[in-house]
Amino acid sequence: MKFGHDFKRALENDMPPGWGEAAIQYKALKKCIKRFVFELSSLGLSAETISKLMAPTTVDPQQAITLSYSLGKEGHIVVPKIIINVNFDKLKTDKFAASMFKQLNASNMITTVRSNYASNVPSTPSDSTQQPPTNTLPSVSASSQSVETCETVDEDIDTQTMSSDMSEVQSMEISLNCDHEFFEKLTSELQSVEGLQREQRKILFNAIDILSHEISLIASPNSKKKYKSLYCWRKIFEIYMDSDIFISCKEADQSHERTPELAERHLKWFDDQVRLAKCLPSSSKHRDRILYAKFLELNESLLKVASFQQMNKLAVTKIMKKFDKRTSLTAQPLFFQVIESDPLLLVDNASKAICFSLSSKLFSIIPQLRDFECAICSNVAYKPVRLGCSHVFCLHCLIILQKQKVDFCPLCRAKEVMKADSRNIDHALMNFMKTYFPREIKEKFEENENDTFTPSSISVVSGQNNCVIM
């Protein structure tokens, strides 16, 4: 009861208007379970009885009546099926099972599916060519009114037992309205949840496109304000990636995807760190501050989508647990197994898809320094030298390696260092760094001037393709 109240209150207070109508209707599903339990009880199938009937035959091989429960699919709708298997030979000595069979047989909710015959006499070579009897029991159909019920249990068994050496196992399907209603309603509501999420994904993807375009204009190195906005947004995105708000990149976090509660705390930490970094202009009307407010709003919207999905997934788990508790039909694992292959139901990809879009569109606008660092000095790899193994190092560090006669690449151990000359300088990458990392390059030059390891003039290699650094 407590979860139902919390679920309803969270939908009303924490979610946008209209989202509650698209969510799982937990209270209505509980009422449906109550009606289903009443239908089962009218057939003598209490939760305790069902638990006994569903016990494996290895527990009680002499069981006269067994029950099996399965779930199938018709389109996106989950369809339940209850099958009662009756062994008439064992039914003679089981008064409880015989009484239950009489109650089921008198009901108009069951249909005979099939009748199988098992011989109690060991087969002989001459018997192998004989065919089993072809006559079967009359079908008990919900639409048929001509079925005669017997006066006593003994008459039922005697008239339907074929012979003393043959035992018949009859399978009957129980069709209950509330059982079908429950799963039809549940899967229909799951589609409503997915429909709302699909709509929200489109809205968020569109917002990402618009925001990325606006940031690319204001943070462009060619803008009138030069590099102020560029470094402002580089710092914002650096803090954002370190925050791991929705998806953790750390191997220690096995789940990787954050819970909405944890994501909310990380989002607040991110906002606090941006304010502490003082990378935003003080004026609230400044374009960078306006775009940052939009960026925060985008993340808060993504957080609501993730919360909505988790709440509904928890509601489904809770309602299926209650279904099993009231009926003992163990439908929960069957249900999740059936909908596992359905791309529309309970898919955990909303946050991942939107975070990927953030990374591929927003973060690609402003290159991060960590992607252009030299692996040796951990500074910008200006005047980048690309070795034959494709690894890139700054010219300053490569000169030191060659001076020390180190031929192995520090990353892959390939013998490429001593082969490097002026042809290995990546001029396109160098121009790119000049455009996006002017401050870092200036600091790099100042550090190199103070480095005692750097002589006034060093030749990278001797010969025709030498590269002289002054």
UniProtKB/Swiss-Prot annotation:
SMART domains: RING. It is found in: Cytoplasm. InterPro entries: SPX_dom, Znf_C3HC4_RING-type, Znf_RING, Znf_RING/FYVE/PHD, Znf_RING_CS. Residues 1-337 form the SPX domain. Keywords: Cytoplasm, Metal-binding, Zinc, Zinc-finger. GO terms for cellular component: cytosol. GO terms for biological process: positive regulation of protein catabolic process in the vacuole; regulation of phosphate transmembrane transport. One of its GO terms (molecular function) is ubiquitin protein ligase activity. This is Uncharacterized RING finger protein C6B12.07c. It comes from Schizosaccharomyces pombe (strain 972 / ATCC 24843).
